[in-house]
């Protein structure tokens, strides 16, 4: 839809003029030109008002009053009235409905020589420093080298600036960064000290660390192998002790203990204790050795292993079987056996002790006595030999008898007095009523 342009209304003294009806091609020419004003005579005083007017067809062509500016040569142009100039308004009517065409510019090209060779660079003088020589990274390397060569890591900044031939502010750039990451500290006004690590150490330290790492790896592998062996042995030992066929063999003999080479010419005491028994050995004195055993699970049994070579003429040697053994240990005993200064402690059904050399076969035992009629038992108390078989531990060697704290009976008891008995109403103290112990208690 085409709208008529707004016109300027003249004063009342002048006649009103309007634009003729024009087609769009006459109103909007394609050419661009500066507007031309038609000479006209108007009144000196007038006022303007903007309003929309109809365009009658009676106006003749070529009238330039109140017309929109167009090109020359028969085209309608806007004529300004004489006197006061109209207000300037910028109307961009040419760009309405038309695509914007960018302004054409000449492309810029690179200057290429005809021969295709680059222009030669101006050579620098021999004394001129390159950019790399004056870089802060290279200056830092030189500064750290001076710091490593200084005594105790203390460096004078004035001397460093003279040696490096740089301004002191560049040295401060380096020291500020190193101080910020806590590698140096300010010792005085112009002295700094290195507080980092691995600057003044042996240069062979990395190779030493690598060697130690390899040794540590080998030790870890060896430890892992030992753990596997211990686990395998523990499992095998558990199966061995839980087997019912092996429980009857859960004992150790005196000969087995005496056959150990480390126990020769030493006093050996075998200890049979329940699980979780606590053994304490205080600091050993010059000649004495003290051992403390404590158990909350049951009684502790202690056995003194005899030395067979000290008593060759013992009367009980023939009657003592060669396989005299300790009492079997309960099934709940846990594995463990410790020896300390001639002390053998047996806590386990099967003790890991080397097998001894079998002793020579003992002499044959005397034949069992034949059955005796009941009437012949009346004179049994008159026999010269003892009724009960005596064992080796009932005889004291001369060496032990001299230092023994036990008091022997004087005169010795007869055979009749060994046959004691108690009634249902008697206690253990009644056994000693038949013998006068007054003299022994006084002494």
Swiss-Prot record:
Principal place of residence: nucleus
Region (Disordered): 1-22, 306-341
GO process terms (BP): intrinsic apoptotic signaling pathway by p53 class mediator; lens fiber cell apoptotic process; negative regulation of sprouting angiogenesis; regulation of cell cycle; regulation of DNA-templated transcription
Localization per Swiss-Prot or TrEMBL: Nucleus
PTM annotation, UniProt: Phosphorylated by CDK2 and cyclin A-CDK2 in the S-phase.
Alphabetical keyword list: Activator, Cell cycle, DNA-binding, Nucleus, Phosphoprotein, Transcription, Transcription regulation
Region (Cyclin A/CDK2 binding): 67-107
Record-annotated DNA-binding residue ranges: 109-198
Region ranges (Leucine-zipper): 157-178
Pfam families in the cross-refs: E2F_CC-MB (PF16421), E2F_TDP (PF02319)
Subunit organization: Component of the DRTF1/E2F transcription factor complex. Forms heterodimers with DP family members. The E2F2 complex binds specifically hypophosphorylated retinoblastoma protein RB1. During the cell cycle, RB1 becomes phosphorylated in mid-to-late G1 phase, detaches from the DRTF1/E2F complex, rendering E2F transcriptionally active. Viral oncoproteins, notably E1A, T-antigen and HPV E7, are capable of sequestering RB protein, thus releasing the active complex. Binds EAPP.
Protein name: Transcription factor E2F2
